[in-house]
């Protein structure tokens, strides 16, 4: 049993009796870290969550953001433990689960993003995990007709046995289509979708402890994307016709969690008969409760509309079971073949005790934060190593496995810019011009060296990416993935992460409208913990998606850097790929500069002065320029000494690879007007050089640092092809 002895005592004392076997399983599921957030909820309440655009924030399956007459929702989820045991099904069902969370709002899922944190490419098990995770996402996403339009892929040896698999889903539709979640006593409760089987048994409990072995494969769910597609279509019609009052995904914890949370959210009770549930396998009633078989949802309907609901479900060949009704007693009551199995107060089920966890900074960090003296390195050799490193290499071999254009909404495709841009259609309630941009970012090395700074920088990076295409950032969701919360030096990472997100969110004016916390990302045999993954997805609004800007050079302009560059190599890709180090203090977060510089970039884009824009992040100025060159197939000549430098910086290698925040590269054909606007905004800038031709050339004053053809650069950057 996944409950502590203290938790078991609380349950027995509150009930005044010993729970039944079925009741124990409900508590094990609902009081797990995965479902209850018992070790994190006190901290995540600190995150800023309010904005005039946020109609409903975190706490339910998915938030609601209003943009004029359009409702937009987005959410991020993790599927780490299942993907470590069965990578194909673990990743695939991660896609299915997040799509169903979006469906609970009544809005159509329109796009997916994946953030993958995978192990070393020279480790055979890690390579096997990576290939199957990517294939699982590809197969499921392609078959349900929801495009995978963007993402991020990190490689690090700490993810060899414990990959971090995150999926974000975006939904949109007319604001009038939103299903807010209502119900009254006597309303009927149905399970719709898949049959209930043995797969995913107590998966929530499995996800709330350290990984052990492949013996846990029975806790991994198995997906059916074709059924999910039918479920999407059926729920869209039910919502459009106003036949559904509330929807709840059957996810972690199975029916035990879904039914109890739904009734509690409605402020009512619920009574169900498990005898009525279709089974794929022969199951005990207790197993029916905690099975996490996929493609299942709970819907609440008015009794007078049941026949219409049944007709729609039959039309799409989606199975359904009428299992119960809402009551006024505030209890979860369940029967099986006439025997009462469950009689529990919902307030007890849904309010587990919150343990007070100790936290302390790991002693090894003091040593790691000092960068040792570095041997000298030739600029061109460093450039090639950084450009070919797995983290900066082209991810084309990954995203071309995904269908990213289905649905006719994708304006800026994967690999073309800092963020993906999607058009909102007139059927969504828009004017045919409105669009949204979205990007999710993380940096495990930053978060490992300093979780406060790492978290703040994850939000800042996603904020810059969204601004770089011309979108105004309006909201964020986060996914925090760390080790065992019972270990003070691991829980410290979580606490400092939340503090960093809170600080930066308040400073940028960005509300967090949802998120996910995943603990126990450790190998129980070795005790090794992952580098913390703090992924932040930022959503932005584009008033006219036709004005959104890609990152590829056109060869028709000057290259201008916006923002200061300082000597900030801590946690950088340069240190790791060239010197084999993860050390130093990550770049200082600069929220005031982030806001000021982002507003300037958006102004330049809206005024039609930017031909191409790329924010500066991992790999520094050199990496940003390389990306722009490869995307556009165009060369450039730049003088790095022309960048605005701070702290007496005069080393070309540091200037090229420093990862100082709040910086962008702009290509413009109207240098005079661009400079006028930049100077009017009081933002540091430098004119680095020009784009054009087929050669990439870096200089420092009159000294040539490196020169290579764009074709050679493309080959160097394509280092993952044939590997993953």
UniProtKB/Swiss-Prot annotation:
Residues annotated for substrate binding in this entry: 78-81, 100, 221, 292-294, 518
Compartments, record wording: Cytoplasm
Gene3D superfamilies: PurM-like C-terminal domain (3.90.650.10), PurM-like, N-terminal domain (3.30.1330.10)
Disulfide cysteine pairs (residue numbers): none
Function per UniProt: Part of the phosphoribosylformylglycinamidine synthase complex involved in the purines biosynthetic pathway. Catalyzes the ATP-dependent conversion of formylglycinamide ribonucleotide (FGAR) and glutamine to yield formylglycinamidine ribonucleotide (FGAM) and glutamate. The FGAM synthase complex is composed of three subunits. PurQ produces an ammonia molecule by converting glutamine to glutamate. PurL transfers the ammonia molecule to FGAR to form FGAM in an ATP-dependent manner.
Assembly with partners or alone: Monomer. Part of the FGAM synthase complex composed of 1 PurL, 1 PurQ and 2 PurS subunits.
Protein name: Phosphoribosylformylglycinamidine synthase subunit PurL
Source lineage: Archaea, Thermoproteota, Thermoprotei, Thermoproteales, Thermoproteaceae
């Amino acid at each position: 049993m996944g409950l502590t002895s203290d938790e078991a005592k609380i349950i027995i004392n509150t009930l005044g009796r010993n729970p039944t076997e079925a009741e124990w399983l409900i508590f094990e599921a609902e009081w797990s870290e995965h479902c209850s957030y018992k070790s994190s909820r006190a901290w995540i309440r600190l995150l800023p969550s309010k904005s005039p655009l946020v109609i409903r924030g975190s706490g339910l399956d998915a938030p609601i953001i209003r943009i004029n007459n359009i409702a937009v929702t987005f959410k991020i989820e993790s599927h780490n433990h299942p993907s470590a045991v069965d990578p194909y099904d673990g990743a695939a069902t991660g896609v299915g689960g997040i799509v169903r969370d979006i469906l609970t709002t009544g809005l159509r899922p329109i796009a997916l993003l994946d953030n993958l944190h995978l192990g070393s490419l020279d480790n055979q098990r890690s390579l096997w995990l990576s290939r199957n995770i990517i294939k699982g996402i590809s197969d499921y996403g392609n078959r349900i007709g929801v495009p995978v339009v963007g993402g991020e892929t990190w490689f690090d040896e700490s993810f060899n046995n414990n990959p971090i698999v995150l999926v974000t889903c975006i939904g949109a539709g007319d604001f009038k289509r939103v299903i807010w979640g209502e119900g009254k006593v006597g309303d009927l409760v149905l399970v719709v979708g898949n049959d209930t089987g043995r797969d995913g048994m107590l998966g929530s409990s499995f996800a709330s402890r350290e990984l052990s072995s492949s013996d846990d494969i029975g806790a991994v769910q198995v997906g059916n994307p074709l059924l999910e597609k039918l479920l999407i279509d059926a729920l869209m019609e039910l919502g459009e016709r106003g036949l559904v009052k509330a929807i709840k995904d059957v996810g972690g914890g199975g029916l035990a969690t879904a039914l109890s949370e739904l009734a509690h959210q409605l402020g009512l009770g619920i009574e169900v008969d498990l005898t009525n549930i279709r089974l794929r396998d022969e199951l005990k009633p207790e197993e029916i409760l905690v099975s996490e078989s996929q493609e299942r949802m709970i819907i609440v309907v008015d009794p007078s509309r049941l026949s219409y609901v049944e007709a729609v479900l039959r039309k799409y060949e989606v199975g359904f079971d009428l299992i119960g009704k809402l009551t006024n007693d505030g209890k979860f009551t369940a029967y099986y073949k006439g025997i009462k199995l469950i009689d529990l107060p919902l307030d007890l089920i849904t309010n587990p005790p919150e343990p007070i966890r100790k936290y302390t900074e790991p002693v090894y960090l003091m040593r790691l934060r000092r960068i040792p003296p570095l041997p000298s390195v030739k600029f061109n050799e460093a450039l090639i190593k950084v450009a070919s490193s797995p983290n900066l290499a082209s991810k084309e071999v990954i995203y071309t496995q995904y269908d990213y254009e289905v649905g006719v909404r994708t304006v800026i495709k994967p690999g073309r810019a800092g963020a993906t841009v999607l058009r909102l259609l007139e059927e969504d309630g828009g004017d045919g011009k409105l669009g949204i941009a979205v990007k999710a970012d993380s940096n495990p090395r930053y978060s490992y060296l300093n979780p406060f700074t790492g978290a703040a920088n994850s939000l800042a990076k996603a904020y810059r990416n969204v601004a770089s295409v011309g979108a105004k950032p309006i909201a964020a969701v986060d996914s925090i993935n760390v080790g065992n919360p019972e270990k003070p030096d691991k829980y410290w990472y979580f606490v400092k992460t939340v503090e960093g997100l809170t600080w930066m969110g308040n400073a940028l004016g960005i509300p967090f409208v949802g998120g996910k916390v995943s603990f126990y990302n450790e190998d129980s045999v070795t005790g090794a913990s992952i580098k913390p993954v703090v992924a932040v997805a930022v959503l932005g609004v584009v008033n006219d998606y036709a004005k959104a800007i890609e990152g590829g050079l056109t060869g028709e302009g000057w290259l201008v850097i916006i923002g200061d560059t300082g000597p900030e190599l801590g946690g950088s890709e340069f240190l790791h790929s060239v010197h084999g180090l993860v050390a130093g203090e990550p770049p200082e977060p600069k929220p005031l500069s982030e806001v000021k510089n982002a507003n300037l970039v958006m102004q330049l884009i809206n005024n039609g002065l930017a031909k191409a824009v790329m924010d500066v992040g991992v790999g520094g100025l050199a990496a940003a320029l390389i990306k722009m060159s490869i995307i556009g197939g165009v060369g450039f000549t730049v003088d790095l000494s022309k960048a605005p430098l701070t702290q007496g910086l005069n080393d070309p290698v540091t200037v090229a690879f420093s990862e100082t925040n709040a910086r962008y590269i702009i290509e413009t054909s109207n240098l005079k007007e661009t400079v006028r606007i930049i100077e009017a905004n009081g933002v540091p800038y430098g004119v680095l050089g020009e784009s054009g031709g087929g050669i990439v050339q870096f200089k420092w004053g009159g000294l040539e640092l490196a020169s290579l053809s764009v074709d050679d650069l493309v080959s160097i950057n394509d280092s993952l092809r044939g590997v993953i």
